[in-house]
Amino acid sequence: DISQLNELYPAVRDQNPYGTCWAFASLMALETTLKPETNIDFSEDHMSINNNFSMTQNDGGEYTMAIAYLASWTGPVLEEDDPYGDGYSPEGLEAVVHLQEAQVLESKNYDNIKKSVFLYGGVQSSLYMEMPDSRSTSIYYDENKYSYCYIGPEKPNHDIVIIGWDDTYPASNFTFEPEGDGAFICANSWGEEFGDRGVFYVSYYDSNIGVHNVIYTGIEGTDNYDNIYQTDLCGWVGQIGYDRDYAYFANVYTANDDESLEAVAFYSVAPDSSYEIYIVEDFKDEASFSTRRLLTKGTFSNAGYYTVKIPEKVNLEQGGRYAIVVYI
């Protein structure tokens, strides 16, 4: 029931006047993962301005930008430290939590989406919204029943958060009746004047709902690690194919201090993947890769961004060069 869900989830917010639905959806999904133990309001302003892609708040965005911002520990920061709507983000703000895992769910796998809503509270997903804001109308939206269903070729242009579902929601409640009953209950970012205090129904048969789905499943305190080594703040922006279903990739780093390697974080771009993580100590050149040593291995059920803890810490000397190699 929408009225009950409104009591359990973060208050619906208003992205007006910017094209920042992606930031609102990702941070609401992040906040729902932390509830009910932690009630926190993250800053959409900070994410949308400090997005590492040199894009403005009116350029739009999507979930890979949100994951990149969070995975790099650029944020999130608190709303009170960077309030929304002024087009300005103060310098020097630091993340108040660290994202260590975000899973990308398989397209249109509704059982997996429902399970994730049950476990984590909210799933970030996307729609094609013919209407640009709450002041507009659309032939695909019923203002009285708060129901939306678009069936057609248009690609997603708006992010929302799936916070519930109703398998018996009547198909007759939609302006264009789909082939069956059922709807996801979604939180929008157009303020409380849209839908039922910001929440609405989206048919299971909508062309885009459930195609792109993200859950933020690993959130830790900022004291979890002393340092993060990274070379690319844009994260996963795409992939190219190979003539095989496996690949190696590696990065070379120089230790800033005497410290220990405790975890390795990377993207897996396909579901049901297995991985092996290696280290090359005292790295000199390409020939050094032959000395790689296995640290750990495992599997991922879903695509996404993962942090894998190393069973035995590896001591690193200040100024020493080392390579991390992943086989996946």
Predicted regions and their residues:
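Conserved "cap/hinge" positions at secondary-structure junctions
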Residues: 127, 268, 326-328
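Short proline/glycine- and polar residue-rich coil/turn motifs
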Residues: 297-304, 316
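Catalytic-core signature of thiol
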Residues: 1-262, 270-298
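Short strand-edge motifs at loop-to-beta-strand transitions and within beta-strands
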Residues: 251, 304-306
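Short, well-structured beta-strand segments enriched in hydrophobic/aromatic residues
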Residues: 264, 306-328
